[in-house]
Amino acid sequence: MKRVILHIDMDAFFAQVEQVKNPALRGKPIIVGGDAGHRGVVATCSYEARKYGIHSAMSSAEARRRCPHAIFVGGNLTNYVYISAQIQDIMNDYTPIVEPTSIDEAYLDITESYHLYGTPEKLAQDLKDNIKKRLQLTCTVGIAENKLLAKTASDMNKPDGLNTLWMNELEEKFFPMEIRKLRGVGPQTEKALKRLGINTLRDLKDYPEKKLSQNFGLHGEHLSKMAHGLSDTPVHSFEEMEDEKSMSHEHTLYEDTSDLIFLKSLMITLTDKVVARLKKAQFLAKTVRLKIRYSDFSTITREVTLNSMTDDVNTIYKTALTLLPVDDVVSNKVRLVGVGVTKLHEAVETPQIELFEESSISKKGKSGDVVEDIRDKFGKFSIVRASSLPYRWEH
Ligand SMILES: [Mg+2]
């Protein structure tokens, strides 16, 4: 059966919330986050400010240069989280399958419920009206048969938009798009694709998949599938994620970064912590999950299921590494990294090993591999004992 997925994206969320709270700010260029704290970057800005070329993650100094009369607002994360929860409540009135992907974005699977409203478009309009009526906030909704196209549809039509991207509209709306607009195509991939003469999604779709795979490995296959508008990732409801037995560790960076060495080292530390907990609880994991939050607060979670259950730090780290979207990480700075394991089962027998202690590295060849790999690639100072890393990085 054809699925119907919505992607809801609140328009300039933090700025809108501030404008609702203080009507004197309405219709004015508002910058949230800029002046507050040590970070000195724009968390988000109103559409009035965007007209001056200001965008999320820009330095406040640059934003002030572009629009000297912009109003800087410190922002109140607690309030945003509170309102985000209210939006989720409203979305839950339309379907139980709601997957929030950030504080102001979510996917909804309305396959089973849209007929109650007549059409998917009517359900989406009702949802938009409801959010507007109850919270005075506008959002943009994309409607399609899968998550990839729903997100693309909402990106096309901001703010206060409602846009469909059905399979029969791809010819007109999707295939003419430039390749860099496709999720997962960062500057590196874009350059490489252009070298092959691929400029639009149509070029990418028509390019032989075999040749793409030769150039990009597994990513090539994925790119080809996306260029055809295909994606079968299900919408995971929040409850479903909560119920699942899982263990994870996350770390919010002191400063956003695109430094791969740093991020990989951080992933080791996080894996180390996860594995320590796994072993302590005597569990084995079947699935490895990586979470990345970018400086604009957009968040991705990727996971892969292993062939067999494990509590081996080497296996879990290397698996997490295959999930790292290197292109995106380099082109968008990262704010938070999380490594986790799910699908846990009790282990029959788990030897207690302290990971990354000198003794275990020298005695246990396998644990040492990861360390040596990284040292080979990135130099001997790229990895030190896990427990000392946060100190080294954050001061
Ligand atoms: Mg938004």
Give the location of each predicted region.
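Short, charged/polar surface micro-motifs in flexible loops or helix N-caps
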Residues: F13, A36-R39, S295-S298, L344-A347
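DNA-contacting surface of Y-family translesion DNA polymerases
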Residues: H7, K181, K191-K333
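Active-site-proximal helix-loop elements at catalytic-domain edges
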Residues: M1-I8, P100, K245, G340-T350
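Gly/Gly-Pro- and Ser/Thr-rich, intrinsically disordered tail segments characteristic of DNA damage-repair
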Residues: M1-K225, F238, I361-H395
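Acidic, metal-coordinating catalytic segment for phosphate/diphosphate chemistry
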Residues: S308-H395
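Short, hydrophobic beta-strand segments
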Residues: A106-E112, T301-V304, P351-E357
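A glycine-rich phosphate-binding loop feature that marks nucleotide/adenosyl-phosphate handling sites
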Residues: E145-L148, G229, L284-Y294, L336-H345, ...
